[in-house]
Amino acid sequence: MRTYIRSMMRLFTIVPLLALSLIATVPIARGDQPPPYRSMLYRPMIEAARQAQTAALAAANPRATNSRSLTLVGSLALPGFNADVWAHKGFAYVGTWGAGPDACPATGVRIIDLDEPNDPTLVGAVAAIPDSTQEDVEVTRVNTRFFHGDLLVTGIQSCSDVGPQGIDIWDVTDPRHPQHLGFWDSIGAFGVHELDLFQRGNRVFVAAATPFAEFAIGEGDFRLVEVTDPRNPVQVGEWGLSDIGVEPNCDDFAQFCTFDHSVTVNENGKMAILSYWDFGAVFLDISDPAHPTFVGRTVYPTGADGDTHSVALARGDNLLLTADEDFSPGEILNPPPDDTWGFLRIWNVKNPAAPVEIGRFSTANSLSTRSDGFYSIHNPVVRGNTAYLSWYTDGVRVVDISRPRAPREIASFVPPGVEDPFGFFPPVPIVWGVVVERDLILLSDMNAGLYVLKQKQAE
C-alpha cells in the first residue's frame, strides 16, 4: 500500500479568460476530483508569465522574426493557449493548454491540412471537452484485429473540479472526418499530462504520465494503458517511486520535487523513460507490461536545479537528450552559472542502469537571468544526428549532435511576438513544440499558432 501524502500548495490567481467556442465535444463521465495539484505543475510558468508581462511592456520595440538557415514557408493563426504539435501523413495536430477554471479554452486538438505548406488549412478539431486541456497528442498507424487505421490519442487534464481526466481516443484515418472511439479515465491527480503511443507485436499501448497521482490517490504517476481495442482501453500496469522505496516529495517547488512529467518509449517498445523532474530520467523495463521494473536513472550533479521535463533518444537508443525546464534562474538554489534558465543535457545511456552525462547545450539567453520572456528549453525531437529543440522565447534551435560532447547549433528560428488574445501572456514568442514532417519543420507557438519551416540547403 502506497503512502498517502496530503500536503497542499497555496493557490495562484489567474487572469479570467474569455471562453472559446468548441468545434467537437464528446461527453465524458466525471470521476471524483482530487485537490488542485495543477497549481503545483504550472505555478513556475504562471509566475514567470507575470514577470515577463511586466518586462515586455517596458521594452522599447516589438520583437521581430529572427531566422538563421531556416525559411518560413507558411503559418496559421490559432487562438491562444496552443500546446504541443504532432504531424502524420500530411496533417498537423495542435493541442490546447490551460491553467485553471478561468483559463481553460478547451479548443481541443486542431487538425490542419499541410497539402499546401505555404497555406496550411484548419479542417477540424477533436477532443474539445469542456473544463479540460488537451496538451499532448500523438497519431500513429496501428493494425490489430480490433482496429486498422490511424489512431490519435491525447492527454486530458481537468481544469476545474468538474473536468475529466485521462486519455481521449480517436480514429483519424480520414482526418477531415474523425470518429471518436473511446476514453480511459485516470481518476487521479488531474489527468494525463504527456503520453507516448506505440505498437508492440499485436498489442497497442499508451504510456502515460499522470503527475502527482502518487500524492493524490496513492497510485503510480506512470500508467501503461492498453488500447489494442481502442473502444475498450484498460490500464495494464503502473509504477511510482514508492515501488523502489522512495517517498515522493514536492515542497512547493522550492526544494527537491519528484513527479512524472512525461514519458517516452524506446524503439522496440520494451523500455520507458520517465521524466521525473528533480529525480531525473527514470528507465523502466516494460517487457512485462503488468510489472514495470526499475532499471536506472540519470543523476544530477550536486547543486543542480534538476527539472527533467522531457527526453528524446538518439543513436540507436544509446544517447538520451534531457530538457531541463527551469523558469526561475538564480532564484531557487544558486545564481548563474549554476542555476540558469533550462537547457539541454546529453547522456550516454548504453548502460541505462548507470547513465553518464557527456554534453550540454544552452542558448545565450538561457544562460542569463533576463525576464522579458521565457528562455528555457521545452521539448526535444531527434532525427538522425540532428536535434530540434523548442525553446519558448528563443524559438526553435537546430543542433548537430554528431559529436555529443560538443553539440553545435546549425540553425534557428525565432518567430515574431504576437499578442495573446486573452492578455494572459506577454506579446513574445512562446514556442511550445516542434516536429519534423518530411522536409518540413513545424512549430507550435502558444500565442500565435502554427509555423511551417524548411531548412535551407547548404550552397
Listing of model-derived features with the role each one plays in the protein:
Residues 1-9:
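N-terminal secretory signal peptides that target proteins for export/translocation
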Residues 12-24:
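Bacterial N-terminal signal peptides
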Residues 28-459:
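Feature marking well-ordered beta-strand scaffolds used for ligand recognition
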